[in-house]
Swiss-Prot record:
Keyword Heme: no
Keywords: Transposable element
Name of the molecule in the record: Mini-circle uncharacterized 19.1 kDa protein
Entry annotated with the keyword Manganese: no
InterPro entries found in the cross-reference section: DinB/YfiT-like, MST-like
Organism: Streptomyces coelicolor (strain ATCC BAA-471 / A3(2) / M145)
Length: 175
């Protein structure tokens, strides 16, 4: 597999649909990790794109929650609690004792669990949204294909946020 100079896996130019979706999702997961690399704890907690309170550490925590929601709750139908507790259901809130290592470990555990849950599933297999979630989508059933495309979109959008935050912190751009 080819990688970018910063170590992210380059998605193949030609592949079957499943391989392509997984590769792009992995690329965007790796992009978020790159955006957080080399920073100190106080920098990861810095809300650097005013007026937003979003931080790089909060984004990592949020994506752990997003991974859990879409692969465990929606696709596999599991009743699992929020990754970082009921009072932090979206993952954005920071806790003074939790740094990047703990947040990344939780995020990577959620990524691994999601991979396990979809390993033998087909792209047309469906998960089930709550009525509230279905109101946004228009249907309570969503295919694994839909979930994977949504996850790519979710990471791409938040990686754009991470770009802005990182640039404000130390001037690093790209990736």
């Amino acid at each position: 597999m080819n990688t970018t100079p910063d170590g992210r896996p380059i998605p193949p130019a030609h592949a079957d649909e499943r391989t392509m979706l997984e590769a792009w999702l992995d690329f965007h997961r790796a992009t978020l990790a790159v955006k957080c690399s080399g920073l100190k704890d106080d920098q990861l907690r810095l809300a650097a794109a005013a007026p937003s309170s979003m931080t790089l550490l909060g984004l990592v925590q949020h994506m752990a929650e997003v991974e859990r929601n879409w692969f465990q709750r929606v696709f596999a139908g599991q009743n699992v609690p929020p990754v970082f507790g009921e009072s932090n259901h979206d993952g954005f809130a920071l806790k003074s004792g939790r740094g990047l290592d703990e947040a990344v470990a939780a995020w990577q555990a959620e990524v691994s669990r999601g991979r396990e849950l979809i390993a033998d599933a087909g792209l047309d297999d469906s998960g089930h949204l709550s009525e509230q979630e279905a109101g946004h989508v228009g249907d309570q059933g969503v295919s694994l294909r839909w979930i994977m495309v949504h996850m790519i979109e979710e990471y791409a959008r938040h990686n754009g946020h991470a770009d802005l935050i990182r640039e404000q912190i130390d001037g690093t751009t790209g990736a």
